[in-house]
Amino acid sequence: MKKLVLTGAAGRLGSYLREPLTKLADELVSTDIAEDIGTLYAGERYVQADLADLAAMIEVLKDADMVVHFGAIVDEKPFMELLGPNFVGSYNVWESAYQAGVRRVVYASSIHAVGMPKKADFIG
């Protein structure tokens, strides 16, 4: 595989998988909204991008063979703070992959699919 794109590269899962994913492709393009993701591995390139920006996602996914989409906000937040990255952002990744002719997308479903207890339930 020539080009693999990873979204959410600064997150918990993305940061753990960056190094192993470099072994699957000639080029790993790691992306996140964070300014920095630390030291890059051999074969890895970092592109700071907002999932909610369709034009940015189209550019990042250009010529990609595969996308591993882990980018999202996983904290308890008001809906409007989640809308851009979690809903619009996921749509943009799928739409960009379709436009680029990407044949494989790996997607980790939201933790909210099974419900998320309020943080207050664990405090006190």
Describe every region a protein language model picked out:
Residues K3, D26-L28, R103-R104:
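Residues at the starts of beta-strands that form the adenosine-phosphate
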Residues L4-L24:
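N-terminal Rossmann NAD(P)H-binding glycine-rich loop of SDR-like oxidoreductase domains
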Residues T7, T31, V67-G71, V105-I111:
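SDR active-site strand-loop-helix element
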Residues L24-E35:
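Conserved glycine-rich Rossmann-like NAD(P)H-binding loop of the short-chain dehydrogenase/reductase
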Residues E35-G43:
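Short loop/helix-cap segments at secondary-structure boundaries that form the rim of catalytic
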Residues E44, A49-P85, V114-M116:
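NAD(P)H-binding glycine-rich loop region in Rossmannoid oxidoreductase-like domains
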Residues V67, K77-V105:
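NAD(P)-cofactor binding segment of oxidoreductase domains
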Residues N92-G124:
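Conserved Rossmann-fold NAD(P)-dependent oxidoreductase catalytic core, especially the SDR/UDP-sugar
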